[in-house]
């Protein structure tokens, strides 16, 4: 299966990543991507860039090293109402916006509170993707999240880093399977991203591949199927998973 885009990556601007925009673009081109999204951590993440950085992204070319770029932010969900940490004026200037739960920005709450936080972000019309909705420290009710994502044309992410055995997120495999079962039922597209913080991880999907993420109830491994969802968000291939 061709992997044409990876729209959740970070550069040195995020404070805990290790390569420049150009180095990440070259890595994406070398791996055959058509589109690379760079989404720096928004300002409430410790060590990341100031809001002015995002405002000034307009000066950066959208084609580099032979690959198309989308430049945006991984926003932090800040409270159980789903507020995020860039204002509307800046958000409207960005190519894409991912909203995610991070423990340095919001403490885990009850399942109801965590779900409300994600739903608040989904219902923000400027949010395009919910990032890594799989971390077990934030228990979630997936059915209302999938329903709201379908209603608002918001993509849910299958995050390669989440399934890395060396990673810090908990119970990600079972959470993703639960989410993807509902995505199939509701015909809700999901998007596969690397969440790369270093050039060599761009376009990686080894942990989020079929062998790891998707299996039927009797253990049979089923493939991810590429589906073109019109223009949708990126005018590219989005992945929807038949998992039952």
Where are these regions (language model features)?
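Alpha-helical scaffold segments that flank or form the walls of functional sites
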Residues: 22-36, 56-63
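Active-site mouth loops of central-metabolism enzymes
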Residues: 7-19, 102-109
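Histidine-centered catalytic micro-motifs
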Residues: 4-14, 38, 130-133, 196
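Short acidic/histidine-rich active-site segments
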Residues: 188-202
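Histidine/acidic-residue-rich catalytic or RNA/ligand-binding cores of hydrolases
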Residues: 15-18, 48, 139-146, 166-180, ...
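Mid-to-C-terminal alpha-helical segments outside catalytic/metal-binding sites
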Residues: 203-244
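Extended substrate/RNA-proximal surfaces in nucleic-acid metabolism proteins
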Residues: 2, 42-158, 162, 214, ...
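Anion (oxyanion) recognition and catalysis
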Residues: 29, 149-150, 184
């Amino acid at each position: 299966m061709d992997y044409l885009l990876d729209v959740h990556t970070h550069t040195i601007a995020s404070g805990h990543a290790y390569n420049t925009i150009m180095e990440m673009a070259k890595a994406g081109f070398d791996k055959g991507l058509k589109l690379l999204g760079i989404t720096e951590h928004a300002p409430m993440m410790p060590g990341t860039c100031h809001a002015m950085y995002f405002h000034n992204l307009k000066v950066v070319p959208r084609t580099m090293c032979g690959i198309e770029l989308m430049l945006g932010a991984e926003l932090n969900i800040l409270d159980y109402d789903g507020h995020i940490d860039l204002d509307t004026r800046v958000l409207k200037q960005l190519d894409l916006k991912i909203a995610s739960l991070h423990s340095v920005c919001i403490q885990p709450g009850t399942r109801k509170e965590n779900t409300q936080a994600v739903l608040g972000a989904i219902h923000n019309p400027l949010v395009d993707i919910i990032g890594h909705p799989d971390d077990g420290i934030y228990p979630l009710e997936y059915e209302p999240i999938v329903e709201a994502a379908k209603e608002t044309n918001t993509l849910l992410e299958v995050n390669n880093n989440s399934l890395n055995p060396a990673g810090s997120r908990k119970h990600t495999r079972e959470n993703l399977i639960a989410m993807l079962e509902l995505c199939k039922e509701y015909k809700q597209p999901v998007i596969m991203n690397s969440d790369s913080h270093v050039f060599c991880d761009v376009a990686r999907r080894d942990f989020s591949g079929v062998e790891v993420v998707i299996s039927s109830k009797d253990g049979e491994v089923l493939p991810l199927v590429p589906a073109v969802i019109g223009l949708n968000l990126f005018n590219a291939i989005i992945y929807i998973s038949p998992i039952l």
